[in-house]
Amino acid sequence: MKMTVDFEECLKDSPRFRAALEEVEGDVAELELKLDKLVKLCIAMIDTGKAFCAANKQFMNGIRDLAQYSSNDAVVETSLTKFSDSLQEMINFHTILFDQTQRSIKAQLQNFVKEDLRKFKDAKKQFEKVSEEKENALVKNAQVQRNKQHEVEEAANILTATRKCFRHIALDYVLQINVLQSKRRSEILKSMLSFMYAHLAFFHQGYDLFSELGPYMKDLGAQLDRLVVDAAKEKREMEQKHSTIQQKDFSSDDSKLEYNVDAANGIVMEGYLFKRASNAFKTWNRRWFSIQNNQLVYQKKFKDSPTVVVEDLRLCTVKHCEDIERRFCFEVVSPTKSCMLQADSEKLRQAWIKAVQTSIATAYREKGDESEKLDKKSSPSTGSLDSGSESKEKLLKGESALQRVQCIPGNTSCCDCGLADPRWASINLGITLCIECSGIHRSLGVHFSKVRSLTLDTWEPELLKLMCELGNDVINRVYEAKLEKMGVKKPQPGQRQEKEAYIRAKYVERKFVDKYSTLLSPSEQEKRIISKSCEDQRLSHTRVSVHTPVKSNDSGIQQCSDDGRESLPSTVSANSLYEPEGERQESSVFLDSKHLNPGLQLYRASYEKNLPKMAEALAHGADVNWANSDENQATPLIQAVLGGSLVTCEFLLQNGANVNQRDVQGRGPLHHATVLGHTGQVCLFLKRGANQHATDEEGKDPLSIAVEAANADIVTLLRLARMNEEMRESEGLYGQPGDETYQDIFRDFSQMASNNPEKLNRFQQDSQKF
């Protein structure tokens, strides 16, 4: 070890020694400053490194999130995952490097400064103190006078002791200086060497890590080159396709008009339509509609679950809507609700209507057998009230309706194609149909044919009676009168196109109806009328039914002796309440109905309760709301009321009769039914939406007439209907369709009117007593 300060000079305490000490002390002070600065920089570097590792970890988490996002791309996901794992290892290596830096630089140099330099400073303080004491002893010894021997000896002893202490401390101080100068070299070099070895280990680990990752990176680079080439190729193809599409004419937007019944994904057609909401504001909202799985559904967003508009297309129909201000509208009607839709153009509207009709037909063909296995689901007839969960005693349903309707002659086979065991019916025509023909009937629209299922739908008693009054034989005698004469053959089962053409010609164009050769003018009709005053008989005597009832079954439907046709028991009229004496009109009995105007024929047949004649009149184009100017503008529906037939009224209503059309006296069907005390008809008209607030020329509404006549049953019905109407108005559009008590009472009256009408004849019987 090379001595920085000489021990001999220390003993001499020469100026050279003092100069050497001054130089060493200055050097040590500067060394302390440098080491303190280096330690602070090391601490800052370590803190910054830790922050770098923390930020790097967040960056790695971002890469992992991106890898999870790219889970559908195996190459990207695998690459990002592998790279993030490798970089995470590098973060771990950085953490180790910073830990080793803290131990090698910060800890070692701080220990050197705190331990060795502190000892040097302590030794320096002792040396400076003893040096000062030595100087004081020398000065005191020099100042002692000769004649003071005692003081001389004392000063000499102090000086000797002080010199001895000085030499001892000075030698220790010099030793500390020399040791410090030697140790600082080793400590600094040792720290830096440890720091460099830490870096060596860091880069060696990184090299090993990336050596393993190198082949994968090389393969990925090759894949990337191929991806770049493929991307350039796809870009050229897309640019070419883009250029081709730009050259097309999109003015008609024919691409949206396509529909495919046999689509692999089950979607027949899809696209945007406007849907009218059922809220109070009737707002229109644009939604994505699709026809799939025999259902019409829509959704606002793709992630939303589709909302089902029509659960079973077989139970609905579609028609144009021209009576609203918005263009291109059409309506999908099911037994329980309707949905108003709007397309963007006329072509799109036609395409959607055709798609719905085609889907309905396809559903009939493919699911004919399955439909019979479906759960019995209630779907009230057109115009009737929502009846909720009815008991079997109050509504006829399923096999019961099927058996009763098929008992009518001709109803055991399809009316149009002859297929056996038909399970569908057209309620306004009174015929039975196979499932395929019923689909074609639905496509005609409800103004031509209203289709119901004999096994799936719920049948109210008056509707079932109507079906039993007509039948396939009766209707075919009218609509196929000229079939053999024209040489036309009925289509066979399975020939759908032939069926569709035949059914349209039969019911829409009415090509096979035997038109009347000549129709007399009104003046000629008057000449051939045999008039007699029979109004008194009509208003004061009980009118007997056309058919004589001979048997009653469990449903309350009475069979007739002549042809098995069903009819209602007769009802009597209340002559005291109807018209003042002397104001009764003369009724007309005609010689031959074929010479009558179809409207007049319907008018006459409605009073006579002759449903076959009524069907014939409608087939010849009779207006169901025809008004007889010779009899106070009375309508066929009013005549049906006067005739006392509930089934006749039901038939006219099913064929579009206006329940609120009034005669010149201001009396509608509800007025006349109330005057005559026909409780069943009052119940029927109220269910069909008759206006009970309308007043006649005398200012009387049906309720005041019933109260005046003291007809408790009709008063009950009218007041209950009025109360229910007020409840619905107070609840607004979002209220329930009717109170359960109201529905139950009306069902009871409907059952009683159809099955036990004699129970409702109390008013007539009481009036006859007087």
From Swiss-Prot:
Residues 6-226 form the BAR domain. The modification Phosphotyrosine is found at residue 734. GAP activity stimulated by phosphatidylinositol 4,5-bisphosphate (PIP2) and phosphatidic acid. Residues 379-388 have a biased composition (Low complexity). One of its GO terms (cellular component) is plasma membrane. ANK repeats lie at residues 632-661, 665-694, 698-727. InterPro entries: ACAP1/2/3-like, AH/BAR_dom_sf, Ankyrin_rpt, Ankyrin_rpt-contain_sf, ARFGAP/RecO, ArfGAP_dom, ArfGAP_dom_sf, BAR_dom. CDD domains: ArfGap_ACAP2, BAR_ACAP2, PH_ACAP. Pfam families: Ank_2, ArfGap, BAR_3, PH. Residues 548-561 have a biased composition (Polar residues). Residues 371-392, 548-571 are annotated as: Disordered. GTPase-activating protein (GAP) for ADP ribosylation factor 6 (ARF6). Doesn't show GAP activity for RAB35. Interacts with RAB35 (GTP-bound form); the interaction is direct and probably recruits ACAP2 to membranes. Interacts with MICALL1; the interaction is indirect through RAB35. This is Arf-GAP with coiled-coil, ANK repeat and PH domain-containing protein 2. It comes from Rattus norvegicus (Rat).
